[in-house]
Structure formats: C-alpha cells, structure tokens
C-alpha cells in the first residue's frame, strides 16, 4: 500500500496541492484486451514489491522522478529477466562465452519476449570504431568499392585497366639488362591453417622454394605452420637474370605463376645502388612508406602484377579489388605507417620540456628527476661534454648544445662513475649519449607494463595526423579507387544527408547497377534510418568514441530498425537525450515503427511529447530512492493525466508548470566575447556572453553547440584564467575575461573509477566526518586517527572483506554470488572501530544513511551539514552516503559535481559551464535544479548552459541559437537575445518552440502551482 501520510508531505514539499486518498486507490488501469506482460512482486533496488501489467506489442513509457525506480523496473527487472531466460535456453557450453546474468528479485514475470537493451552509454572506446563501422554501412561501402570501384594509378591518376600477359612481360623486359628477378606466385594470402596440401602440391609440381610469411624456405625441409595464425605462402616459380633471349623462359614462368595464383604475380626486382632505376624505385618506396635499408648495396623491390589492375604508363599495379583492401582494420588495407588509425602518438617536446626557462636541476626536463643519483651522474657527463652547466636554463643553451642534449651523438663515448644505491662501491660506465628523445623511446619500449607506457603517452606524447595517409587510415592503393569521382574515404567525410544525395544522383552503367543494386539498397536503408533518428548531420568517418550517450543510443536504435526483427522486447533509456525538439517527432516515428512491425517497445523517458504518444504509461514514485519504488499510475496517457496522485499525470494535465520569469536579468553590463570561431562546422562565428546572467546555447542536433562551448570557449577561457593547458579549437580572439576569476565546466563524466568511490568522498565531506569521529573522546582514548575510519586502508576496516562489506563467490555457469561478510556483517569496519559512536551511530551507520537523513543527523556540525545540504539541493537527497559512484547515472554524477562547486565559497565572479544538466531529470527535478542555478546567478555568477528542454530555455535571460541545421548546414549564429526576442525570429527552430511555449503560458494565464 502507498504511504498516504508521506505522499501528502512529499507533494507539499514540492509545492503541489494535496491529493485525496480515493484518487490514489484508482490509479492503475487494467489491460482489458490482447496479450499482456505481467510483473508481480518486483523488489529490485528500491522497488517496493510492485506489481503491474501492460500490453504486449505496444509503445510503453515508464516515467517518474530521477531515482524513483524506472530503470530498476525497465532494465534491472524486465530486460534482465528477458535476457536471462533466453540465455538459459542455450547449452552450458554456449553460456560460458556469453557471460552470466543475475536473476532479478521478482516473484513472477509472464508474457516476456527475448529482450534487447539500447542504453545511452557510449560503449565504443576503440579508436578504430567509427560511425560507419558501428552502423555496418562502411562494410557495405567496402563491398561496393570492391565490386564496381574504378581503380586509378596512385602516381599519374590514370584509370587502371586489366593487364594481359604480354603487357606484364613487356614491363619486366623494360628493366635494365642484368637485373636479377625472383618470380613469386602468391597461392595463399593471409589465411589461417597449416596449408599442408598447398605445400605438397607445390613440391609435386617441381617447385623447390617458397616465401612463407616473408622468409625464404626450401620445400624439402619439414615445414610446420601454426594453424591458429594467418599465413602468406608465395611459391618461387623461377629466378631469372634479364638478358637477351630470355623472353620465352620469362613468358612461360609468368604464365605458370599467374595460373597458380589466379592471375597474380609478384616479382622481386634487385636494384643496385648504381643502377639508373635506383632513384625512382627508392622514391616510390618512400612515397608508399615502405621501409628499406638505405646503406645496403642493393634493394629488393617488390613489384605486384595482376591481370586485372595495373597502370600501363607508370608500371604500377594495385592488388585485386577485395573488400579487405578498403578496411583500415586489416593489414591489407590499412596505412602501413599508422596501421589504420589515421594518427600517431609522437613525442611532444613541449610536454617533455614544459618550461624551457628552467634548468635541468630545476627539473626543466620533466621526465628526469634531478634528485636521482643516476640521472645526476649521467647528465653531469652530458653537460661536461657539451660545455654547459646543469644550472643553465635550457633556453640559454646554444643550438649545438641543445641538439646534443636532445638527439645525442653515437660517435662520442662518455665516461661516468655511478655510486651504487646500496652505498657499497661504484660502477663505471662507458657509452654514447643517445639523447633525451632516444633515451625516452628506449625506456618506453622497455617499459615493464602497459600502465607505464600509457603513463608516458599521457604525459609526454601527443596525437598527430599520420603524415603518410593524412588521417585517411588507408593505403594509397585503396584511396585510388573511386565511385562517382570519390574514393571511399571522401565518401565517409560526407554527412548522412549529403551521402543520401550522393547516392540518389549516382550515375551507374546498366551492368554496374545490376551488380550493386542490393548493396545500394542496404546502404540507402541504413542512411535513412540514421536520418530518421535525427542523426543526419553525422559523418561516417567520425570516431565512435566522440559520440554523446544519446547519439550512440540512437545509432544502436537505427541498427535495430535496420535489422527488422519482430517479436522482440526493446528497452530504451531516454532516447531523446541531446535531441532538439524539432527532431523529436522523427525519433518517435522510429519507435512506433518498431512497435508496428510486432515488437514491444519499453522506453524510460521524461520528454512530454513521447509521454503523450505512448500507448501505455507507467508512472513510478512518489519520490526518489527510498521514497520511490511504487506504481503511482498505469494506463493510457489520458488515464494517467486524470490521476491526481501522479506527479507526471498532473504535469500532463497542465496542473504543475515551471513559471516563466516576468523579467529577464540584464547582467552586470560586462560581456565575454569570443571571435572567429572556426572549429569543426562553425563558420567563423563570434558571440558575446553577458556576465551576471543565465545564458542558454541552443540549436538543432549537430549545429555546433558543444564545439563552441566545450571545444573552444571553455578551454580558451580556462587556459587564460586558470592557467591550464587544455587543447582549444580554432578561434581568433577572446576578451572580457578580466571580469571573472574562475571558469568551471561541469560535465557528466563519472566521479570515480572504482566501486569504493562515492559522492561524499568526491565532495570532501567524508574527510570531515572521519575527522569528527577521530576527535571523539572514545577515539582519542584508543589513539585512533582519521585513517582508522576509512574502509580503503588497513587499520580500521574489516580485513576479511577488505572494507567491501561483501564476499564475492565465483560460480561456474551461475552468476557470481555476493554474500554478506560473516565477520563484519556488512559493516565494512572491524569491531573496535564500530564501537566509536556519535549520537549512537557508528561510521558504518552513517554510510548507510541517505543524504537527506545525514543532513538532519549532522545539523549541529555546520561544515558537514552545509556540504550535505548542497547534495540535497540538487535533488540527490535519496542516494546513500556510501553508494558506489559506479551506480550513479551521468545526470547524477553531474549534479554531484555541481554540489561540489556549490559547497565552495562563492566570489560572485565565477563562470559555470554546463552541458545539458537536465539529462535524466523529471520535470519536478528540473524545477528544483533550476532553483539552484538561478540562485547561483542571483549571487552575481554567470551560467552558460547547452540545453534542448524548452521549459529550461524559457527560464534563460539570454539565448544564443546556432544552426539553422546540423552538420554543414549549421555552424552559424541564427538568433540571439531574450526568449521573447528569439521567439520572433522565423529562421530559428528554437524560436518557434519557444514561441509556442510562451503562447501556451499566455493562454493558460496564471500558473497553477
């Protein structure tokens, strides 16, 4: 049963009229017809033994305050059980490869389908993943280019036609007389297996040698290949010296090689250093980035011939057009210099020597600690040889001295004597100085583990575009193949909208159309699915790691739409995140399409338009955390809107609204301006941000909001004011910063990386709580210090569970079992530590309190209560003090950071930057958050926020609207001014929706609270 008294008080607290007991007893509508999904006794997380039913094959939206239990029902109960049942239908052998699923805490779920979860997390951290690879469109591109692509010579650009045997022979005979050749027939190219039959057949055919994985071997020898590895086998058909009368033998050998390898032959051409061809051959090798020994008397050039692809003028052949040639994740297609990444980590002199005005002894070379006896001894010898002092600032060294310090000299042998650390004797060293750069490279290559290498990369390296492929990831042979005048990389650089237009206008021959029709159909479908979920501004070459959570989720949604599965239960987590109101209808159309083809679509959502479109609405509440977990209303949106005990229902009925300010702040008269911003799609724009006011940056998805605020403005302002060293995008000038003393960006990244991190450790209040316990008379009598009350270090924690409170037991084919520690009984600390009490509560009891409870408990300790109150003020009163940071959503993590900043003393001259802080928030939570933000501005601070929520935009003092479209169609300032001024701009999409909201409020008259 619902706690009626609590509900009364809760609604009174948030400013909603009290409700009647009768209305609460009639808030659940039964499913009257058709198949249904029934949940009975769900107790996962904060769900209070709830039971609910809803129709199958419908669009079902779950709403409620943040932390009320929406995700617990949707993901941790429905999805988890649907996936678990499917996995249990598999064999135990198959299950071992698929991970283990916990059984949710629920009595019964009936009517479930196999479940697919589409969450808002950005899961693609691999730098090789792009929008194209994630959506599989790039796979179809590779197939398309392999089938109808037109190859061109990488050197002269001429279209390459098929090569006949005579053309191949003529090309070889055009080389200098006396040239030594080895003719290879590549019978196996990069395939796994032992390939015993291939080798035996070659022997039987009379061949005696082969090149296997780059090494020449005798076929008579015992050859054993690892069947788990990929191998390349090239049979040596003949070894020839070019001379008069050799044509017939050469022709026979070429034909034999071509026949054995399906029209492909490799010729190893020995070019001596004094040959005329040496310069042109080495130039070609350099252009391709192919390594060779520059000091050798000759080089062996590998010339690839094909009966299909070769330039008759330059003699350049390219491999057979296969899909793998166009893959930057395959060695046959990837740029050999950067291995398909498009960029390389290179040593950054500015990071190694961040301040050249310092000397070595002042740690001018960041990597080398001058206090180290080894470094001191070694660099003393270096300085002596170069003729400078270790106290000399590095920027005062001569060019010759610095060159020796940086690059070394292998011809100069240094002597130095090193005193052993043990103090027992000395060691004498005689060796050349390799230079700082080479010494760091050696240490990097010899590093004992990945963590040490990663540390060196982060500290002393920077990413730079690959000089060979210029960021295009592919080898030249792949980039010289075109369709419609564009190579595959140029095609991926187009936005989704531009690509759709490209394929619509593509002119193909009848034969090409017949070959490519099915592939083009798949490409067009997937591109249109991306467009329909509001991602038409994305380019396919964009790294998947740079996508926001909402973008990543909508990409996965488009992939699922493309798969056209039926009979599935889809569970989505706020797919409208990061989406402008203009694009919302297309997203809803995609969700209803999934429903219409025969799927159950369950969406956790706060967006009003989505709530009204739902076939069935489940509202969970009434509050968050321990105050939530109950079904407040269940039925059609119209039914829920009639339920007086449902906050969401009252919101849909228009009974609660966020009051629009009657007056807008003018600011304090000062502005921060940034001019000439040209990063990404921004088109040399300039904007002015009023100080002492609340500004919203708006615009359709992909219009350039994040680029302007996060990639350019914040790093530029922070570098000037906070003396940071963030990489800033392209801009010409930033001014007005003298009027602010701090700039703080509050994003949605996690507040901790381990399960032991929690909100109170992040904001620093747990240190104060530990200090309080250590200052108690009982703790002092026992000699306890602050560390005694930490569960992260030895001393006060329970060592049986190492402060975790639980013991993990691994089960083979069953989920891991977490049992309460039988020593501390889940308290985390040992018995002696728990005997120290404050107001009758131990340190463990405090960690189990909610923020709301703790704020009341510590009300007599101002420096603790004040920080806890800030967490409560941003709507986090329901979370526990000891709750793991890993369980917090992105929105919750952002609000913890906001609370941390609010807890600091305000100067009234701080500029706060927020990126969609309303993500994951219910209307009531947004109302509370906006109260906090408005208080910040009332103190004289400046808040600049990226936002799509029209309710929030209408609260702003000033709007900067970018657009008018996304991608190349955006990047311009469309409108600026107050919401009322922007609403009059007919070119602004944001202005249209703001105008609608203002009109609605005007028609409603006095807002009902």
Task: Name each region found by the language model.
Residues 2-1009:
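Conserved phosphate-binding elements of NTP-dependent enzyme cores
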């Amino acid at each position: 049963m619902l706690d009626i008294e609590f509900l009364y008080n809760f609604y009174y607290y948030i400013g909603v009229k009290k409700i009647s007991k009768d209305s609460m007893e009639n808030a659940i509508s039964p499913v009257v017809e058709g198949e249904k999904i029934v949940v009975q006794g769900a107790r996962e997380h904060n769900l209070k033994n709830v039971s609910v039913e809803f129709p199958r094959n419908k669009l079902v939206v779950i709403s409620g305050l943040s932390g009320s239990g929406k995700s617990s029902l949707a993901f941790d109960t429905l999805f988890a059980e649907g996936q678990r049942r499917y996995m249990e239908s598999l064999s135990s052998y198959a299950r071992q490869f698929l991970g283990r699923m916990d059984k949710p805490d629920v009595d019964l779920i009936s009517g479930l389908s196999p479940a697919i979860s589409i969450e808002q997390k950005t899961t693609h951290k691999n730098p090789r993943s792009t929008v194209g690879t994630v959506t599989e469109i790039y796979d179809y591109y590779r197939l398309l280019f392999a089938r109808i692509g037109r190859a061109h010579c990488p050197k002269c650009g001429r279209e390459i036609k098929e090569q006949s045997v005579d053309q191949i022979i003529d090309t070889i005979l055009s080389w200098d007389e006396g040239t030594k050749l080895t003719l290879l027939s590549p019978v196996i190219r990069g395939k796994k297996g032992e390939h015993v039959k291939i080798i035996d057949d070659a022997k039987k055919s009379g061949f005696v040698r082969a090149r296997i994985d780059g090494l020449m071997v005798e076929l008579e020898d015992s050859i054993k290949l690892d069947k788990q590895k990929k191998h390349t086998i090239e049979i040596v058909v003949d070894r020839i010296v070019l001379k008069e009368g050799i044509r017939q033998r050469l022709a026979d050998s070429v034909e034999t090689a071509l026949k054995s390898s399906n029209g492909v032959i490799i010729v190893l051409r020995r070019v001596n250093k004094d040959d005329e061809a040496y310069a042109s051959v080495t130039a070609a090798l350099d252009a391709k980035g192919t390594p060779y020994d520059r000091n050798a008397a000759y080089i062996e050039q590998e010339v690839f011939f094909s009966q299909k692809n070769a330039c008759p003028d330059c003699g350049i052949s390219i491999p057979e057009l296969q899909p793998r040639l166009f893959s930057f994740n395959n060695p046959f297609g990837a740029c050999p210099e950067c291995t398909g990444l498009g960029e390389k980590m290179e040593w950054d002199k500015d990071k190694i020597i961040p301040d050249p005005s310092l000397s070595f002894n002042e740690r001018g070379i960041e990597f080398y600690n001058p206090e180290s006896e080894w470094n001191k001894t070694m660099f003393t010898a270096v300085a002596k040889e170069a003729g400078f002092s270790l106290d000399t600032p590095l920027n005062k060294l001569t060019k010759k001295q610095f060159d020796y310090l940086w690059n070394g000299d292998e011809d100069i042998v240094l002597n130095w004597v090193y005193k052993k650390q043990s103090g027992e004797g000395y060691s004498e060293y005689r060796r050349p100085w390799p230079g700082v750069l080479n010494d760091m490279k050696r240490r990097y290559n010899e590093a004992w583990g990945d963590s040490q290498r990663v540390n060196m990369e982060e500290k002393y390296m920077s990413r730079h575009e690959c000089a060979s492929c210029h960021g295009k990831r592919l080898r030249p042979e792949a980039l010289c193949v075109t369709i419609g005048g564009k190579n595959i990389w140029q095609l991926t650089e187009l936005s989704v909208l531009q690509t759709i237009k490209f394929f619509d206008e593509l002119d193909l021959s009848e034969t090409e159309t017949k070959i490519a029709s099915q592939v083009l159909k798949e490409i067009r479908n997937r591109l249109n699915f991306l467009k329909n979920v509001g991602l038409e501004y994305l380019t396919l070459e964009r790294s998947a790691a740079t996508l926001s959570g909402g973008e990543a989720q909508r990409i996965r949604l488009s992939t699922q739409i493309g798969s056209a599965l039926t009979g599935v239960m889809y569970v989505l987590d706020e797919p409208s995140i990061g989406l402008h109101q203009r694009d919302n209808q297309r997203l809803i159309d995609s969700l209803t399409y999934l429903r219409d083809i025969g799927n159950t679509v369950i969406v956790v959502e706060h967006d009003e338009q989505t709530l009204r479109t739902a076939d069935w609405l489940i509202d969970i509440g009434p509050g968050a955390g321990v105050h939530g977990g109950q079904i407040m209303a269940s039925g059609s949106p119209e039914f829920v809107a009639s339920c007086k005990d449902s906050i969401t229902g009252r919101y849909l009925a228009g009974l609660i609204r966020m009051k629009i300010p009657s007056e807008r702040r003018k600011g304090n008269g000062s502005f921060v301006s940034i001019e000439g911003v040209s990063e990404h799609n921004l088109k040399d724009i300039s904007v002015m941000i009023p100080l002492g006011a609340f500004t919203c940056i708006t615009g359709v998805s992909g219009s350039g909001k994040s680029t302007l605020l996060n990639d350019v403005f914040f790093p530029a302002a922070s570098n000037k004011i906070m003396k940071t060293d963030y990489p800033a995008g392209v801009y010409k000038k930033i001014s007005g910063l003298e009027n602010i003393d701090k700039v703080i960006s509050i994003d949605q990244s996690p507040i901790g990386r381990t399960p032991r991190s929690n909100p109170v450790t992040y904001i620093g209040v747990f240190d104060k709580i530990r200090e309080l316990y250590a200052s108690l008379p009982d703790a002092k009598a026992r000699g306890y210090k602050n560390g005694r009350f930490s569960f992260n270090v030895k001393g006060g924690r329970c060592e049986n569970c190492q402060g975790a409170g639980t013991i993990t037991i691994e089960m083979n084919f069953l989920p891991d079992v977490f049992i309460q520690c039988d020593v501390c009984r889940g308290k985390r600390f040992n018995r002696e530590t728990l005997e120290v009490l404050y107001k009758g509560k131990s340190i463990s009891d405090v960690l189990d309190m909610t923020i709301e409870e703790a704020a009341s408990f510590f009300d007599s300790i101002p420096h603790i209560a004040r920080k806890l109150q800030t967490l409560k003020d941003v709507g986090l009163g329901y979370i526990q003090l000891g709750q793991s940071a890993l369980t917090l959503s992105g929105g919750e993590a952002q609000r913890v950071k906001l609370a941390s900043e609010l807890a600091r003393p305000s100067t009234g001259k701080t500029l706060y930057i927020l990126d969609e802080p309303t993500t994951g928030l219910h209307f009531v939570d947004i109302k509370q958050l906006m109260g906090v933000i408005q208080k910040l501005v009332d103190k004289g601070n400046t808040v600049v926020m990226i936002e799509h929520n029209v309710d929030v935009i209408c609260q702003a003092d000033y709007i900067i609207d970018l657009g008018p479209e996304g991608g190349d169609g955006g990047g311009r300032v469309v409108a600026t001014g107050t919401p009322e001024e922007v609403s009059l701009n007919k070119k602004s999409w944001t202005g249209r929706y703001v105008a609608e909201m203002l009109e609605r409020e005007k028609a409603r008259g006095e807002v009902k609270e």
